[in-house]
Design a protein with these regions (language model features):
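Short, conserved beta-strand element in jelly-roll/cupin
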Residues: 1-11, 115-117
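Catalytic core of Fe(II)/2-oxoglutarate
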Residues: 17, 68-141
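Short, acidic Gly/Pro/Ser/Thr-rich loop/turn segments
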Residues: 9-14, 101
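Double-stranded beta-helix
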Residues: 13-91
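Histidine- and/or cysteine-centered catalytic micro-motif in compact active-site loops
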Residues: 7-9, 20-22, 97
Length: 141
């Protein structure tokens, strides 16, 4: 997922992010804690229209990684991270699945989301899909 963000704060306030560790490091740390994928549960979610399509194992793991990072307060305090202020009027581009990030402050933002096919990416081996597939030892989609 490639996202383009623009801070349009009319009062000139920055939008402040914390950007964390490389995705492979995050995946290796949290993957052992995640619940296993259940195809029947994915089918039930789709049948009940909780999800728009059948959730893949990759989607399942990415959602859990996100939740695990947010709920682990020790990780949030101790993980390597950088504060990134984006001034009002600035635009930035981010592979949001690959970049551990959290918004710390700011409001009034525009966002455009682009979905890139994994096989069309410049370095397919660096994608979150490839990294999680390597770490689990299996295909996830």
């Amino acid at each position: 997922i490639l996202r383009v963000f623009t801070n349009v704060n009319p009062e000139g306030a920055a939008r402040v992010w914390r950007v964390g560790e490389p995705f492979e490091q995050v995946g290796a740390q949290f993957l052992p804690r995640l619940k296993p994928y259940s195809r029947w549960q994915a089918r039930a979610l789709k049948t009940l229209h909780v999800t728009k399509s059948l959730r893949s194992e990759y989607d399942h793991l990415m959602l859990q990684l996100h939740d695990a990072m947010k709920s682990d307060l020790d990780y949030q305090e101790q993980a390597g991270q950088v504060t990134m202020p984006f001034p009002s009027g600035s635009t930035w581009v981010c592979f949001s699945d690959q970049t551990s990030h959290a918004v710390m402050s700011g409001q009034y933002m525009l966002e455009q989301t682009l979905h890139l096919s994994p096989d069309r990416q410049y370095d397919t081996g660096a994608s979150p899909l490839a990294i999680l597939s390597r770490l689990t030892g299996r295909s996830l989609v």
